[in-house]
Amino acid sequence: MPSFDIVSEVDLQEVRNAVENATRELASRWDFRNVEASVELNEKNETIKLTTISDFQVKQLVDILREKLVKRGIEAGALEIPEECEHSGKLYSVEAKLQKGIDSVMAKKLVKLIKDSKLKVQTQIQGEQLRVTGKSRDDLQGAMALVRGADLGQPFQFNNFRD
């Protein structure tokens, strides 16, 4: 029986490259001259800390980072960015979290979405991924198109396609 897995993964090496590119752009941008601003990746916690002297510039930093991530092939939805900036002393900062894995709530939403579509496939939650099994390849491709088309706020990848 053909099957595939739905996962949500982020390549940390590409994130590191995007952060370095954003830092490089910070050094050359006119509006960030003589401004204390930084973009730091914490690989252990899988977070990116954006720090600068005003909340407006934090939003600019977020836009720069998103642009660099998209150029490196990482969807902007892979970053979970809080609306409010933290203010400490003279600096504003935002700690963006990388979304990796499919949590149980999102997995249940995906299962419900696929079951409500009346496709002839079965879904199983396996930890932080979802296994979709069907009798025909066409049904599986329909499920892939359905998941791609759904706006669930998190990017998904498909791997381990078996025939």
Curated annotation (Swiss-Prot):
Keywords: Nucleotide-binding. The keyword Nucleus does not apply. It comes from the Bacteria. The keyword ATP-binding does not apply. One of its GO terms (cellular component) is cytosol. GO terms for molecular function: nucleotide binding. Disulfide bonds: none annotated. PANTHER family: UPF0234 PROTEIN YAJQ. Belongs to the YajQ family. Nucleotide-binding protein. This is Nucleotide-binding protein NT01EI_1072. It comes from Edwardsiella ictaluri (strain 93-146).
